Amino acid sequence: MTKHVEIFTDGSCLGNPGPGGYGIVLRYKDVEKTLSKGYTLTTNNRMEMLAAVVALQTLKEPCRVTLTTDSQYVRQGITQWIHNWKKRGWKTADKKPVKNADLWQALDKETARHQVDWHWVKGHAGHRENEICDELARTAAENPTEEDTGYQPS
């Protein structure tokens, strides 16, 4: 039987672009694990995406996943927009390169390993796990240790 894992993610950026971070809560049965990391220069969308990528990469085997994010960009991108981007060779409808294609491709690869049910919650609305992720992401952004090598200034 496939394990069911709950994942909650959030990204934060102090300035956009600026220092950023992600926060993750993973829950399997009654066990919770938190992850976070800060980056010196990035964007809020990249941190939202990276949170989902890292969370899914953390799972050692294919799982049934309920992934909750407060990012419509991530949820809509992976459930709706990505299909046409792939058909067009990672180009938008107006033939421009898809922003954050490196992370979209990583997220696409990870979602193929798992059975993911995407959920959206309003940020800063008292959702327990989202508030934990937000705090983890903000704290990580305030203490960045990594470089976001995929970040490309527009």
UniProtKB/Swiss-Prot annotation:
Keyword list, A-Z: Cytoplasm, Endonuclease, Hydrolase, Magnesium, Metal-binding, Nuclease
Gene Ontology cellular-component terms listed: cytoplasm
Location(s) in or outside the cell: Cytoplasm
Stored CDD domains: RNase_HI_prokaryote_like (cd09278)
Annotated RNase H type-1 domain residues: 1-142
Cofactor, free-text remark: Binds 1 Mg(2+) ion per subunit. May bind a second metal ion at a regulatory site, or after substrate binding.
Subunit: Monomer.
NCBIfam families: PRK00203.1
The protein's name: Ribonuclease HI
Species for this entry: Vibrio parahaemolyticus serotype O3:K6 (strain RIMD 2210633)
GN (gene name): rnhA
